[in-house]
Amino acid sequence: MDSDTNRRANEPARRAAKGVLRWTCLIVLLLQGLTPNCFSFAAEPLPPTHVDDFIGRPRVIIMSDIGNEPDDQMSFVRLLLYSNEFEIEGIVATTSTWQKSAVHPETMHALIEAYGKVRSNLLLHAKGWPTAEELDGRVFTGQPGYGLAAIGADKMSAGAEAIIRAVDRDDARPLWICIWGGANTLAQALLHVRATRTAGEADRFVGKMRVYSITDQDDTGPWIRREFPNLFYIVQPSTQKGDDYYYATWTGISGDVYYRNGAGADSTIVTNEWLDANIRSKGPMGKLYPRFAFIMEGDTPSFLGLIDNGLNAYRRPDWGGWGGRYIYRQPYGETHAIWTQGGNTFSRVTSQDTVAGVDGREYTSDQATIWRWREAYQNDFAARMDWTVKDYSHANHNPLVEVNGQAGTAPLLIDAEVGKQLLLDASQSRDPDGQGLHYHWFHYGEAGSTDANLASVTISGADTAKATVTATGVCRPQWLPRGQCLGNGTAHIILAVTDDGSPRLTSYRRVILTVHSGSTR
C-alpha cells in the first residue's frame, strides 16, 4: 500500500482521534473554568467593506426564549406576517438569563396554528407564504439548560442539529441567526463542528453565518466571539443582568418611555392603546398579540432589517435600515472587532444617527437609527395585519419604486463628480392600489461610515419625483482638522415613496454615490 493510499485509509481514524482530543481538551478546560485555546482558526473575518450581494430571500434561523415575557410572542407574530420575505429554516426554543431551565416550543406551535388560519387570506396579497405545516416542521428545542453549563460533547440538541443542517445546505446565501434569548444552542453547534471537522471545514462553516443578537442573554455570546473571532456578529455586548439594555440600539424599536432613551421619537405609535386599535383587533393573529410588560417587540430588530423594502441594510450593517445601523469596531472587553455601537466622535464616524424628532429638533443617538423609521415599520405591520382579514381591494399595498429606469429593490451604484449635477428620476414609480405618491429624497450622512471618506452632497427637489444631487466634496468636514482628503468618497441617498392609503405605506430605494474630484478620476 503506497503512502497516499495508506493516508487515505487512516483518515477516518485520524479525524475521529482528533475529535476525541478536541472534546477532551474542551471538557477539561471548561471544568477548570478556563477558556479553551486548543482550537485555532487561521481564516480572517469578512472585511468591514464586504457587501452581501446575494440574490433571493434571506435565509434565517430564529432562536427565542419565548415564554419568559410577552415581547418574544409579539415579535413572533410580526415575524409570521413577514414570513414570505424570508426562508425560515429553523425556529429554536431556547433558554436565557430570564428563563434558565425551560423552553417553550409549544407556544411557537400555537402561534403557527393561528397563522395557518389566515394564510389563505395572506395569499390574496402576496406570494411566498410557507404553509403552517412547513413552519411546524422547523420548530426545534435547543439546549435545555443555561449557558455554557449546558453545552458539551454529549449535549447535542435538535436545535443545534438544525443549525448545522441549515449552514451545510448547498446555498450561496448566508444564513442569518437571529438571537432573541440565550446563544448556547448556537455555541453547541459551533463546538460540535469544530470538534468533528478540519480547521478549514470549520472556517467555511463559520463564514456562512451572520449573527444578530439582542445583547448577551447568557454567558455563551461573549464566549462564542472569543472562540470564533471570524464569525460575523452584530451585538452590543452586555451583562447578563440586563442593567445596561437602555444603551443598546435595539431599544429604539419602542423603548423610549421604559428606558428613557428615545428623546425625539414618536412614542404614541408603540403604546398598548395604538396596538389595541391597529393590531390586536384584527383576526386570529391579532388576538394572540399580547400586551407588553416592558417594551413592544424588543427582539424584532434582529429581522426587521432583512425585509426587502429597498433599504438593503442586511447587505452591510453600517448602511442602516429598519433594524438599526452598526459600525465595525472593537468594544472594550472584546478580543477583536465586531459589528456594534460606539465609534470615534472626533472623526464623526460613530454608530449614532442625527435625526429630526417629532418636535422638529435634532436628536443624536444609537436608538435613533431605528426609531427614525418607526412610522413606516408600524404602518407596514398594521397593513400586514389587515391582509390577514381583508381582500385585496380593501387593503393597502406598498408602492413600487423605480429610479432612473431601474425597477426592483436593489441599490443603485452611480459615479458622481464634485460640482456636477446628477438627476435622479423616480417619476415612473407606481402604486398597486392606484393611490397618489409622495417622494422624499435625503442624504443618509452616516450610512457607510466604515468607508474612509464620507462625501458631502446637496439635494434640490427633495420632495419631488425628480431630484438633483450635487456632490460638494469628496470628504465631509470633521470636528478636528486633518490632512489632505485622498481617494474617493461615498454618499448614500435614500428615496422614501409613501402612498395615500390607510395606513400610509412606504417603500425605499438606496442610491450609493462614489464621489470623486475631476482630477482624481
Please give the residue ranges for each predicted region:
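Extracellular and select intracellular beta-sandwich modules with Ser/Thr-enriched
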Residues: 504-511
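N-terminal secretory signal peptides that target proteins for export/translocation
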Residues: 1-19
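Short, solvent-exposed loop/turn segments at the edges of extracellular beta-sandwich modules
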Residues: 498-504
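N-terminal acidic, glycine/proline-rich low-complexity segments
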Residues: 41-423, 429-455
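Extracellular interdomain linker/stem segments of modular secreted and single-pass surface proteins
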Residues: 514-521
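Bacterial N-terminal signal peptides
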Residues: 23-37
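Surface-exposed, flexible coil segments in extracellular/virion-facing regions
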Residues: 443-480
